[in-house]
Amino acid sequence: MKCLITGGNVKVLGKAVHSLSRIGDELYLEPLKDGLSLRTVNSSRSAYACFLFAPLFFQQYQAASPGQDLLRCKILMKAFLSVFRSLAIVEKSVEKCCISLSGSHSHLVVQLHCKYGVKKTHNLSFQDCESLQAVFDPASCPHLLRTPARVLAEAVLSFPLALTEVTLGIGRGRRVILRSYQEEEADSTSKAMVTETSIGDEDFQQLHAPEGIAVTFCLKEFRGLLSFAESANLPLTIHFDVPGRPVIFTIEDSLLDAHFVLATLLEQDSCSQGPCSPKPHQPVPQKQAHSTPHLDDFTSDDIDCYMIAMETTGGNEGSGAQPSTSLPPVSLASHDLAPTSEEEAEPSTVPGTPPPKKFRSLFFGSILAPVHSPQGPNPVLAEDSDGEG
């Protein structure tokens, strides 16, 4: 494989790599007849991104040498990102970029031709790999939003950098709402600040979604996508369904196509505070192998099996984690077998997902009979024998 990129397209390629670096730690490079594909996926398989650069994007493009099969490789994202670390320098000094991949060499060669005849050559180690492909279909999503990326990029500027997730929904008057999502804690006494941005439907080229629908997804990957789309001055299309189904972001142009697929949080309860205030969720990009055991399964005398079954129930019903995280392991300490205080023994109405310890108390309290300790000392059934007599 050999391709040559010139002019401003070098910066476009660098911007794409920066967007991909916000998702995964590995870059999958695959030359195709339709163009050069750059893909990545995060470690939890809850976010996937793909850029396909058409042959017209390059001044020269050769997917494979005559008589040779198409090659594909996997590279460390940090290594490839180092080539385009400073986009300002790339824009000012780099005139063209040549990327070559050969089966007879053990390196991916990226050569930057700079001003004044300076050449920078990067030999990047790679591994052979299978093709990375996510299964998704934007046409299957009933809801669609299409707007210039600048509109959404300006909207997310109001959110703090430390914010993990954002909720996108349709409010009253068909206004698009972006709201910061904070997972509620059972023992939280102070409410965190909530930021909400409202955008009128006149700023959208297409808006096909009913009022009240809302999905929550990770903001970090969304920022990276908006950064690329805004710099390329391209519109962004959002395909989404009900909470729990992935949201698909697409960018289409004659020179490139981009697809970002992000997992959304699943609603466990009905929303009562509007379309953009979802209740606790759990990610569903991966099929869960565990299922909620029947109550009869808890009557086993084997305490290990009992704990495993209970832990599975707590993981399925009490998960309220982010798309890229999972429920922390359940502690098997002996003091968790029964409530240790009056607050734990009495069930209370708590908004949000109760912590795992609360679930342990409720599950055991519903299966095991409560143990009441007598108020006074235990009665003496037999007195101590007199050792001297």
Curated annotation (Swiss-Prot):
Region called Sufficient for interaction with ABL1, residue ranges: 266-389
Modification Phosphoserine occurs at: 272, 277, 341, 373, 385
EC numbers: 3.1.11.2
Cell location: Nucleus
Residue ranges of the region described as Possesses 3'-5' exonuclease activity: 51-91
Composition-biased stretches (Polar residues): 319-328
GO MF, any single term: protein kinase binding
PTM comment, free text: Constitutively phosphorylated on serine and threonine amino acids in absence of DNA damage. Hyperphosphorylated by PRKCD and ABL1 upon DNA damage. Its phosphorylation by PRKCD may be required for the formation of the 9-1-1 complex. Phosphorylated at Ser-341 and Ser-385 by CK2, promoting interaction with TOPBP1.
Catalysed transformations (reactions): Exonucleolytic cleavage in the 3'- to 5'-direction to yield nucleoside 5'-phosphates
Keyword Hydrolase: yes
Modified residues (Phosphotyrosine): 28
One of the record's GO cellular component terms: cytoplasm
Entry keywords, A to Z: DNA damage, Exonuclease, Hydrolase, Nuclease, Nucleus, Phosphoprotein
Region (Disordered): 271-296, 312-389
GO term, biological process aspect, one: mitotic intra-S DNA damage checkpoint signaling
Pfam family, one: Rad9
SUPFAM superfamilies referenced in this protein's UniProt entry, alphabetically: DNA clamp (SSF55979)
Free-text function comment from the UniProt entry: Component of the 9-1-1 cell-cycle checkpoint response complex that plays a major role in DNA repair. The 9-1-1 complex is recruited to DNA lesion upon damage by the RAD17-replication factor C (RFC) clamp loader complex. Acts then as a sliding clamp platform on DNA for several proteins involved in long-patch base excision repair (LP-BER).
Similarity comment text for this entry: Belongs to the rad9 family.
Assembly information from the UniProt record: Component of the toroidal 9-1-1 (RAD9-RAD1-HUS1) complex, composed of RAD9A, RAD1 and HUS1. The 9-1-1 complex associates with LIG1, POLB, FEN1, RAD17, HDAC1, RPA1 and RPA2. The 9-1-1 complex associates with the RAD17-RFC complex. RAD9A interacts with BCL2L1, FEN1, RAD9B, ABL1, RPA1, ATAD5 and RPA2. Interacts with DNAJC7. Interacts with DNAJC7. Interacts (when phosphorylated) with TOPBP1.
Protein name as catalogued: Cell cycle checkpoint control protein RAD9A
Organism: Mus musculus
